[in-house]
A protein has these predicted regions:
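Long, positively charged, glycine-interspersed low-complexity recognition regions
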Residues: 236-288
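Alpha-helical recognition domains of nuclear gene-regulatory proteins
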Residues: 38, 87, 208-211, 215, ...
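GST-like domain detector, emphasizing the conserved glutathione-binding G-site
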Residues: 1-172, 287
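Acidic carboxylate-rich catalytic motifs and surrounding loops in phosphoryl-/glycosyl-chemistry enzymes
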Residues: 50-51, 226, 276-280
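GST-like fold's C-terminal all-alpha helical module
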Residues: 131, 136-259
């Protein structure tokens, strides 16, 4: 198996759809949740490793890249949520295993197919898919982040999972990660609001709901009425990251996102995650 490192090595070089998938993540990171929504919908079994938000010791094998998500796929490292989704889309399409809306009907946003055309080539993105995936990254995820970390109370609410879902971390480590992580994200949210010139946070969030309603244009999904596409999965992942927060509850009563979200829950179904591991040993470094 290929040794992990800072790559990048295209997943397209793999002989087929990878069987051993390990996602290094923060459980509530919107970009990590995009990847998990894709993996769940495609039915690809995967394990997750929770990265400590301060020490990031679980990413010690990645000497240069210290962000999440990082996917190890049959020993090959792939960084960045869009690169992960696009690469796996291409591999699944190549084998004729890609679930989702067909190309041409508001179709699934595909990626390159490793230069190998034919029956298994990934479908080209529709204008709606490409535009909405940019919108998720450049607007929606930022606005959601600013909202859930705008107050220290909601920031602590968001980091509550650390105290219950990272059992292999000691109690002091869990408490420290929650306090420092919540405080750090509170500061980052303030900086993001200034950097991206965002207005009142809830008003921006409701504006995003209205923008989504407009893009949905009466369809069941962004990709059409039959099945969701990758843009749907990305929006769904970002929202699923904040389930249980005040921001999520307010989104569910504003506009048409609730019926779409419920339809997405039904379409995605049960998670294909095999296990969640916190503090497990990272892969051996490649020495490169």
């Amino acid at each position: 198996a290929a040794a992990p490192g800072d790559g990048p090595r295209a997943l397209a070089d793999l002989g087929g759809v990878p069987k051993d998938l390990v996602l290094y993540q923060y459980e509530v990171c919107p970009f990590c949740c995009k990847v998990k929504a894709f993996l769940d919908f495609q039915g690809l079994p995967y394990r997750t490793v929770e990265v400590h938000p301060i020490s990031k010791s679980q990413l010690k094998f990645s000497t240069k890249y210290k962000k999440v998500p990082v996917l190890m796929a049959d020993g090959v490292q792939c960084n960045d949520s869009n690169e992960i989704i696009n690469s796996l889309t291409a591999l699944l399409a190549r084998e004729g295993r890609l679930r989702g809306a067909p190309a041409g009907g508001g179709g699934l946003l595909g990626a390159f197919a490793g230069g190998r055309g034919g029956r298994g080539a990934a479908p080209e993105p529709s204008e709606t898919e490409a535009r909405m995936r940019r919108w998720v990254d450049e607007r929606f995820a930022r606005v959601v982040t600013v909202n859930i970390y705008e107050t220290l109370g909601e920031s602590f609410q968001t980091f509550e999972y650390i105290t219950t879902e990272c059992p292999s971390w000691g109690p002091v480590e869990r408490h420290g990660a929650r306090v420092v992580g919540a405080g750090l994200m509170y500061v980052i949210a303030k900086r993001m609001k200034t950097k991206y010139n965002l207005g009142e946070s809830r008003a921006e969030l409701f504006a995003c709901c209205d923008e989504f309603d407009k893009a949905l244009a009466g369809r069941r999904f962004l990709a059409g009425d039959k099945a969701p596409g990758n843009a749907d999965l990305c929006v769904f992942g970002v929202l699923r990251a904040v389930v249980g927060t005040d921001s999520f509850r307010e989104v569910m009563v504003h506009g048409k996102m609730k019926p779409w979200f419920l339809a997405m829950e039904a379409a995605v179904g049960e998670s294909s995650r095999l296990s969640q591991e916190a503090g497990v040993p990272a892969p051996a470094a490649s020495g490169a």
